[in-house]
From Swiss-Prot:
Keywords: 2Fe-2S, 4Fe-4S, Iron, Iron-sulfur, Metal-binding, NAD, Quinone, Translocase. [4Fe-4S] cluster 1 binds at residues 94, 98, 101, 107. It comes from Rickettsia bellii (strain RML369-C). Its cofactor is [2Fe-2S] cluster; [4Fe-4S] cluster. Gene3D superfamilies: 3.10.20.740, 3.30.200.210, 3.30.70.20, 3.40.50.740. Residues 78-117 form the 4Fe-4S His(Cys)3-ligated-type domain. It is an enzyme of class 7 (translocase). GO terms for molecular function: 2 iron, 2 sulfur cluster binding; 4 iron, 4 sulfur cluster binding; metal ion binding; NADH dehydrogenase (ubiquinone) activity; quinone binding. GO terms for biological process: ATP synthesis coupled electron transport. It catalyses: a quinone + NADH + 5 H(+)(in) = a quinol + NAD(+) + 4 H(+)(out). [4Fe-4S] cluster 2 binds at residues 146, 149, 152, 196. Binds 1 [2Fe-2S] cluster per subunit. This is NADH-quinone oxidoreductase subunit G. Its EC number is 7.1.1.-.
Amino acid sequence: MIKLTIDGQEIEVSEGTTVYQACTKAGKEIPHFCYHERLKIAGNCRMCLVEMEKSPKPIASCAMPVGNGMVIHTDTPMVKKAREGVMEFLLVNHPLDCPICDQGGECDLQDQAFRYGKGTNRFHENKRSIKDKYMGPLIKTAMTRCIQCTRCIRFANDIAGIEEMGAIHRGEHMEVTSYLEQTLDSEISGNMIDICPVGALNSKPYAFKARKWELRHTASIGVHDAEGSNIRIDSRGDEVMRVLPRVNEEINEEWLSDKNRFSYDGLKYQRLDQPYIRKNGKLVSASWDEALKAIADKIKSIKPEKITAFAGTLASVEAMFMLKTFLQKIGCNNYNVNQFDYKLDTTQRGNYLFNTTIAGLEKADLCLLIGANPRQIAPVLNSRIGGRVRAGSLKVARIGEGHNQTYKIQDLGSDLKILEELALDEHKFAEELKAAKYPIIIVGDGVYGRNDGHAILSLIHKIVDKYNIMRDDWKGFNILHNHASMVGGFDIGFDTSLGKLEDIELAYLLGADELPFDKLKSAFIVYQGHHGDIGATKADIILPSAAYTEQSGIYVNLEGRPQIAEKAVSPVGKAKEDIAIIKELADCLKLDTLVSNLQEIRTKLAKEYPIFANIGKIIDNKFAKFSSKDKLSKEPITAETINYYMTDVISKNSVTMARCVEAKQEMSSRGLSTGSRKKRE
């Protein structure tokens, strides 16, 4: 440990700590622009200057490592004068257009100029002006405001892993740019907006829409993937204005994927705002009483075993639990969250989770991707993997091509024989698995989305057992889930085995839109959802429900952590919350569902399933070796790129996401997208 004195206070810090970090530990506020705790140190804004005894000049505290016996002063006339001088230089070419800047009210430059600036300006010459750069449909630039802190450049290189930002020219003429002025290729590019300390990079969809003090903030969870990223929904009235990340060190740190951040405008379009009943082949509007009575009458006329319910990718745990309880009351035990027919083993919780945990990736030293594409399925999780690779602490190999990652990766091939050889210790990569202290295997839908998924999964379990990848001190087997509802559905047993879809007489769809509807031609379809997607067009009765921003709900992320998405705005039109709809349908059938409100549902959930008594936490889970007698096919393993920006009913109806798709297609046609070409190591 190193001892130093800061403003008369003696503190101890570990070796390698910077003076800035030591000052922060001592409770001192040091102004800064270029420094960011998750980025490499640049030391180019000079706003963090402090006085060090025996030094003739003030030092940049963010770049100076501590030394024994250092005496630091953070509030002397020298420091005050230095900060005023730095701020004056930073504002020399700044346009000072705060009234029309989207960053106004939440701008570091604005706040620090007020606190540390001189209040007067000696510069009377003409200011420089820089042409705004094009960075795609998500980021709006005003580069004249840029103070060259280089945070965006370091984020692109160190976190996103795509070196597409940089600086050109020197001195006063320096410009931050994306070189070719093309759409940024990263799936987490929107984070550059958050870390920009001025108004140079702003959200294009949010531009000129609102001020910070007009907005109501609601804590929620990102539901467009299975990561469970913590988000903050900013709303004005009953309109969602923007979505920002919340800090959670165990999941998303402070980053957020572009889909979770920008797809909120899809909540405005193609919404179901009133019940509909199909009459004479056409859907016509109806009252709630009429729609619920029609469903109740239909249920009474059908044998319970001929009724099946499917939950969609955005269904909350409470909604699925309420629907399951309702179905059991009418004698039906057919319900499933797995509308994609993924071949997963759900007999033990550890068999379908990301057992290493997201934060646990920081400990892994070898990663084997099998049919997995984490860049598009879990972009924030992927940034953790990339950071470890670039730090030289993790090696990544993959079985299954068809995608490109943002870090160095070793291609082992795509033949199923590779897995068989690994299981028998006959492949050269086996030596690396044996040598690794903390190896992990990540299995994607390129495996469990196949018809022979169970057979491949059985083979992977043999590899896990062979190389001791799941043990008391290390959990290295991981399933990479695609959808927010899957783990929660599995946790409450909403995954009963199904018979032939052709035999179903009534299908109750809880936001399910990805079913093989050609097999449900003879079924009476009830669709409970919030968007007019495929399921709604096939339905005989539509019950309009609330989106995730319009009702409170629990979602369990891929590592098995239950979290609550709070209600931010009211449902549109005559739409109702999911549990209210199911409760009214139960009342129509004169059923006692034993629960009448959200709190009662959560209390019952916690009693029946211990995981829901630990909101925000991960519990220990059992893992059991899985074996299958299914035969392997001869098809190679692939993990093809997907339409990342459109994977659910909200993102599919987002104008912003549509613009992203168009921009990516244009880049791909020009051969500029990293997703359109493969790199091999």
